[in-house]
Amino acid sequence: MKAIAITHAATDGSNIAYLQEIDLPTPVAKGHDLLVEVKAISVNPVDTKVREGFSADTPRVLGWDAVGVVKSVGESVTLFTPGDEVWYAGALGRAGSNSEFQLVDERIVALKPQSLDNASAAALPLTAITAWEMLFDRLGVAENGNEGDVLLIVGAAGGVGSILTQLASKLTKMTVIGTASRPESQKWVREAG
């Protein structure tokens, strides 16, 4: 299978010269793994951070947020079957989604919402998970609750901020205030809630 891997450290964080197309054997699903044919990915800040800190002797396939179709399943898989369209934020310790196929543990995968195209769905997993956990798990906000409270979101038009803005304005009774620097970002934040 074809994959894009980093071959050397990219010390300035933006240097893509060390991203190279490589050929790898197609992995085999075992245990709780799904073999997913990758259809769309997004570039996450984690990709840049891993590129900056890369120091291994062998190439590393990056990429975490992805959408794809399950091609085969390991013997312990119970949640998915071949043909399922899925989305996920992969695991740091495994080969990434910048490849034709990826092994992903079924326990960190969900069915892709049918209302989203592949590119839109691939842009959501890690940002959406982070925003949800921040609002409901870390801050302890109750769904449909917290009336009278105010939530200030700095960077409300960014990746996590944009999801957090929508979750807070649609799923809680809080007053949501968001900051954004550019006029087009300010307009988007106002329209999002």
Predicted regions and their residues:
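Mid-domain Rossmann-like dinucleotide-binding core that forms the NAD(H)/NADP(H) cofactor-binding site
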Residues: A122-G193
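Glycine/charged-rich beta-loop-alpha catalytic/anionic-binding loops adjacent to active sites
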Residues: I108-N118, N146-D149
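Residue-level preference for short coil/turn positions at secondary-structure junctions
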Residues: K30, T81-P82, D105, E147, ...
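A structural motif shared across PLP-dependent enzymes of the aminotransferase-like
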Residues: G93-E106
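Glycine-rich beta-strand-centered segment in the early N-terminal region that forms part
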Residues: P25-S42, R51-G93
